[in-house]
Design a protein with these regions (language model features):
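Compositionally biased linear targeting/interaction segments
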Residues: 1-275
Length: 275
């Protein structure tokens, strides 16, 4: 199932290159459907590819030198506001990642708070390995986590831009202080009619008028994807979620696998015949 998804992503890259338009968007076939692959009379594989490029990468928040990236911090702060999150700030996320043991502010949290938990534990002091680590953050609740999850990702690298063709309304609202929900929904409606194939066209939208929004941290391509697989065979079911990376040359490799997940396949099914 995972290898099938990789082949689909390679083919998508080749088609984009042939058309001289290196853009990833929700109207592409891989993004619209979950593939149904008959194994034999006793089994079936379901495969869904999800774009991770439209989310804010948590690991952009603190640089390799330990400095806080102001653009990412501001975007996360605006995302929290767009989602109506009031019981948590970005500061404990910074403290979770940075190498020191000093809380960044009165709203932060370092080892001192976590060691008083039952059972006690320490901060990560490194980039997030998984988005699920957010559950360990001081002040995090299941309600806040559920609200944040569709808009965030923990990639194994920093510096990956947000794909403006796949960003959610809340992520679009995080791009500038003056962006509101109506403007974000208007942008989504426009890209559903015609995707953005040039960042300058995106930045020139009337919704951004007077904001001076820059292209920093924005892109039209996606490098990381989530492959959701569900195998049913002889009445047994196995679920797996993989993170795959497609490099600028179109090669795709797996960077993370997680088994034991609940079924997360939600897209319209499309059955592939043998071969």
């Amino acid at each position: 199932a995972e290898e099938f998804a990789k082949r689909i992503l390679v083919r998508d890259y080749e088609e984009d290159k042939e058309n001289s338009v290196m853009v990833d968007s929700p109207d592409e076939f891989w993004a619209m459907h979950a593939a149904i692959l008959p194994l034999d009379d006793s089994g079936v594989a379901e495969v869904q590819i999800d774009d991770l490029g439209g989310r804010i990468n948590l690991n952009n928040l603190v640089t390799a030198s330990g400095e806080v990236d102001p653009i990412t911090k501001d975007r996360l702060t605006r995302l929290f506001r767009a989602l109506g999150i009031t019981g948590l700030t970005v500061d404990p996320l910074i403290d979770w990642m940075d190498a020191d043991d000093q809380a960044i502010s009165a709203y932060g949290a370092e080892d001192g708070q976590y060691l008083m938990a039952d059972p006690p534990y320490r901060t990560g002091n490194q980039p997030f390995v998984s988005i699920t680590e957010l559950r360990l953050i001081e002040g995090m609740t299941e309600e806040i986590y559920a609200a944040l999850r569709p808009h965030l990702v923990a990639l194994p690298v920093s510096g990956v831009g947000i794909n403006v063709n796949t960003a959610t309304a809340q992520v679009l609202m995080s791009l500038h202080e003056d962006m509101n929900e109506a403007q974000a929904e208007s942008i989504i409606a426009k890209r559903e009619e015609e995707r953005f194939e040039n960042l300058q066209d995106f930045l020139a939208l009337p919704e951004f008028s007077g904001m001076g929004l820059k292209a920093n941290g924005l892109t039209l391509q996606t490098r990381f994807f989530e492959v959701v697989s569900r195998i049913t065979y002889d009445n047994r079911v196995v679920n797996m979620v993989s993170t795959v990376y497609r490099n600028p040359e179109g090669q795709v490799r797996t960077v993370h696998r997680d088994t034991g997940q609940k079924n997360r396949i939600t897209k319209e099914p499309y059955t592939f015949s043998e071969g």
